[in-house]
C-alpha cells in the first residue's frame, strides 16, 4: 500500500470523505487522491516521492508557482510580528490601496477570508442596497457554498451530480433565478418575469467551474445593459479570474464595468483570503457606515495581507501577463495538435492563464448543456494516464486548469508529449 493510500484510509475515518473539500477526493475521476508533501515552482511532490507538473495550482492562487521566494519571505516577516491582532493594521490599508489601484472599478474594498464569504457578502449588500430579494445566477456557475448559490451550481456540485444540494431550504432557493450562461434572452425573460424584484446578477466572467467557458462577445455588455434597464446591480465574481485573465481582471479584458467585484485566490498568494468591493455609494451601505452587516474575526489578518501584497506586487511587473498568456497559448495549441494527430475529438478553451479540456465532437463549448454533452468517461481515463506520466490536471472534467509563471517551455513540451502518448491509448 502506498503512503497516499494509507493516509487516505486513515483520513476517511476522521474526515467526511477523507478530504476537506469534495473535489479533492477524486470522486470525479475515481481512484485514490494524491497526498502532497511539498511543492516548488511548477511541481508537486507527493508523499510517495513522485513529482508532477502541476496545472491545478491550489485551484488558482499559485500564479507565481509554488513556494515563491518573495511570498515566502513576506510571510516569514509577518509571522515574526504576530499572527493575528483583531485590530486594524497598516498592511490592510496598503493592500486595499493596491487592490483598488489595480482594479479601477473598485472605489472601496472589504477583506474577508474566502471566496464564499466574498460572494455571500456582496449579494447581501446588493439586496440591502436595492431593497430587493431575488438574484440571477447561471447554470454551471459556482460562487461558493452559500445556501442561495447552490442552485444548479458548478464545481464540486457538478462533479457530485448534485445541482441542488440537500440542506438548502426551498425558501432560500426560491429567490435564486437560474439562467443559461451566454444566453441573454434567458436573462431578459427572468427580468421581465420579476421586473421590480431582482437585486443583482452574479456571474463568473469566464465560467471556470464548469471547466473553462469564455463569454460570447455580447454577453457581459448585455448583462450590464439589462442591469441598468431593470435597476439591478451587476456583481462580477472574479474569485477565479481576478489577476489571472489580466491584471485588472476579466472585467478589464472584456471591457465591462460591474457595480461590485468579488476576489479571492490570487489576492492571498496561497493564504485564505477573499474580498469584495465596488462603487463607493454601494460600499458605504456596509457596516459600520451603513446598515448592511458583515464581519469576520480573521478578516484582513496580517499573514494573509502580507502574502497577498507580495503576490500582487510581483504580478504587477511589466510583461507578466504576456508571458502567462504565451505559456497558456503554447499548451493549448500543443494539446489540440496532439489530439488531432491521434484522432481524438478535443476542444481546448483558454483565456489568459486558465484553460479547459473538453472531449467532445462539437466545434465549440459555450454553455452548461455543451459541458454536459462532453465525454466524462474519456476524461477520467485521460486524467489517470496523465497522472502516470507525471502531469497533475484537475481531478474533475468540470474544473479549469491553471498556468503559472513558474512553468517553463520545457514543462509545456513535456506535457504535450505526455498527452500525445495518452491520446494514443484512448
Swiss-Prot record:
In-chain residues carrying the UniProt-annotated modification N6-(pyridoxal phosphate)lysine:
265
Pathway membership: Porphyrin-containing compound metabolism; protoporphyrin-IX biosynthesis; 5-aminolevulinate from L-glutamyl-tRNA(Glu): step 2/2
Q: Name one GO molecular function term.
A: pyridoxal phosphate binding
Instruction: Specify whether Transport is a keyword of the entry.
Output: no
GO BP: any one term? protoporphyrinogen IX biosynthetic process
The GO cellular component terms are: cytoplasm
Name of this protein? Glutamate-1-semialdehyde 2,1-aminomutase
Identify the species of origin: Yersinia pseudotuberculosis serotype O:1b (strain IP 31758)
Q: What is the lineage of its organism?
A: Bacteria, Pseudomonadati, Pseudomonadota, Gammaproteobacteria, Enterobacterales
Q: Which gene encodes it?
A: hemL
